[in-house]
Amino acid sequence: NKGPDAVQALKQGKVDCVIIDEQPAKAFVEKNSDLKILDDAFADEEYAICISKDRSDLTEAFNGAIEELKADGTLDDIVNNYIGDDTKGKTPYESPADADHSKGTLKMATNAAFEPYEYYDGDKITGIDADMARAICDKLGYDLEIDDMEFDSIITAVSSGKADFGAAG
């Protein structure tokens, strides 16, 4: 169920291959020189943020913030900071000094095991999804709290109200 467990099983010969998203696969191969990525893609996927159907106001606010972040180049900068040989590490997202977080805190449910989307750097969850969520919250006037959980628990956490939204690579 977890990328690191699958990679360990592969290295131990318990499985013949691991099918995982491209960017986490690259992170695993970078740390395990005895592994390789095949040239043929298994499938193309799209990613999304999940928000409870009962929170249409939050969905609309997120969609608006995402459009603004696309238009001003912030989302591209976030992605480029984690993916790309020429840009990796060069455009880290920093909350604006004057960011207003007076509306409270939004909680993001994630599974921090899919570098570069979300992963631990020391004791802090970072990555594309974490930075994107932080940028959205900055636009909307909220602080961000990130809750790491099992991947299969994210939708339940969001639909039950334990988390305001979910994002997990």
State the predicted function of each range.
Residues 1-4, 12, 19, 52-60, ...:
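Soluble non-cytosolic domains of exported or imported proteins
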Residues 7-43, 152-156, 167-169:
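A ligand-binding cleft/hinge motif common to bilobed small-molecule-binding domains
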Residues 10-11, 49, 62, 136, ...:
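Hydrophobic residues within well-ordered alpha-helices
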Residues 22, 26-63, 66-95, 99, ...:
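Periplasmic-binding protein-like
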Residues 39-40, 76-81, 144-149:
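Surface-exposed patches in mature extracellular/periplasmic domains of secreted proteins
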Residues 101-169:
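Extracytoplasmic small-molecule ligand-binding "clamshell" domains
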